Regions:
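Conserved acidic/glycine
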Residues: 1-58, 64, 266, 270-363
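Short acidic/polar alpha-helix capping motifs at helix-coil junctions
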Residues: 2, 23, 113-115, 181, ...
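Cofactor-binding active-site loop characterized by glycine-rich and histidine/acidic residues
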Residues: 34-37, 44-186, 204-210, 215, ...
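A general secondary-structure junction signal
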Residues: 76, 258-260, 358
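Short acidic, gly/pro-rich beta-turn/loop elements at beta-sheet edges
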Residues: 82-84, 202, 266, 353
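Glycine-rich ThDP/TPP pyrophosphate-binding loop and its adjacent helix/strand module
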Residues: 132-337, 345
Length: 363
């Protein structure tokens, strides 16, 4: 990995409370993943799950420093991002600019009143009020939408930036070029975060990108390309905040490549161990650099965590089947449990709604 130099690291300005909050959010993202996988294996969930295991540092570090008025456009592996946006304002703060855990759990359980109206169990949702752009299955398809959103914001005198998240495979799509080219010409504050987990479903990165670093694509547009260690929440925070300041100052878009590794198959329908398209040794090596363990080590070095505190919760290094509730802080378990209880108690969608919300209803 060739790290991009970051003058004046933004993470050095974080308080002890900020750093510990990041640590808790990493655990929350991991527990969300662990719990949902367990629920699916018990037959309590429908649809497909896309695990964010091993990629939590990108979810937490990239949005931690955003303003409430900034926009995000998550991809399918970023499900916790929907309820983690603006979480620094308070996990239970009803006024924060992020979805509630109840809304997201209702979405996952396909319940009536969920953001997706039970049409989908995963990430094809959004909220204009909360400044979360609706996601799409079309690779790189949200980048031009993100460009349009911040163009409108700029025309209205705003100073918001947008983070649009994509896998490395999406950078091989034509719309990726068209959207970033347009954003570069008009200096739009679009930050394209590329979650390079080395695999686009079953296609390795070297068959998608001809260069060693995806961030090199930025050179063709005359914009910055940053490279972050996607396992280190503080490095992700630093690189994204540098891109945010660049964009907010009116200089335009950038690409932030977060190098990470996909812990499991593409989704729970893809048993890559049975398909054998990934080397088991490569998978084992990729899982060794757990973002929770890296953050824990950094906090101990800063004396923000004592030795006793550091061993209280040990979810890192454990697979979803191995981890238990005892491996997670009680406030994390309680928060997600509230959302799940709400979802389970919510009604199923009535059959008569099946034809609704397909087209815009007339006034």
């Amino acid at each position: 990995m060739k790290p991009h130099p970051t003058p004046g690291r933004a993470s050095e300005q974080l308080t002890k409370e900020d750093c510990l909050e990041m640590f808790r959010q990493l655990y929350l993202a991991r527990y969300f993943d662990v719990r949902l996988i367990k629920e699916k294996k018990r037959g309590r969930l429908r649809g497909t799950l896309y695990s964010s295991h091993n990629q939590e540092a990108i979810i937490v570090g990239s949005i931690f420093g955003l303003r409430p008025t900034d926009w995000i456009s998550p991809v399918h592996r970023d499900m916790p991002m929907f309820f983690m946006k603006d979480m620094r304002a308070g996990w239970r703060n009803p006024d924060r600019m992020g979805m509630s855990i109840e809304e997201v759990c209702a979405q996952v359980w396909c319940k009536s009143g969920s953001p997706g109206r039970a049409r989908d169990n995963w990430s094809h949702i959004g909220s204009l009020e909360k400044r979360i752009i609706h996601s799409t299955s079309m690779l790189a398809g949200t980048i031009p939408v993100a460009a349009g959103v911040v163009l409108a914001d700029r025309l209205n005198g705003g100073d918001a930036v947008v983070l649009t998240f994509n896998g490395e495979g999406s950078t091989a799509q034509g719309i990726f070029h068209e959207a970033i080219n347009y954003a570069a010409i008009h200096k739009l504050p679009v930050i394209t975060v590329v979650e390079n987990n080395q695999w686009a479903y079953g296609t390795p990165v070297q068959l998608e990108v001809p260069t060693e670093d995806v961030a090199d694509r930025a050179k063709g547009y005359g914009i910055p390309g940053y490279i972050a260690d996607g396992q280190d929440v503080f490095d992700v925070y630093d690189k994204v905040m540098e891109a945010v300041e660049y964009a907010r100052s009116g200089k335009g878009p950038s690409i932030v490549e977060c190098k990470t590794f996909r812990a499991y198959g593409h989704g729970d329908h893809d048993d890559d161990r049975a398909a054998k398209y990934r080397d088991p040794h490569e998978v084992e090596e990729g899982r060794l650099r757990d973002p929770l363990a890296i953050c824990r080590r950094r906090l101990i070095e800063k004396s923000y965590l004592t030795a006793d505190d550091a061993i209280r919760f040990m979810a890192e290094g454990k697979s979803s089947s191995e981890a238990t509730t005892e491996d997670f802080p009680p406030e994390v378990v309680a928060y997600l449990d509230e959302g799940i209880r709400f979802a389970l108690a919510s009604p199923e969608p009535p059959a008569e709604e099946g034809g609704m919300w397909v087209f815009k209803e007339s006034e």
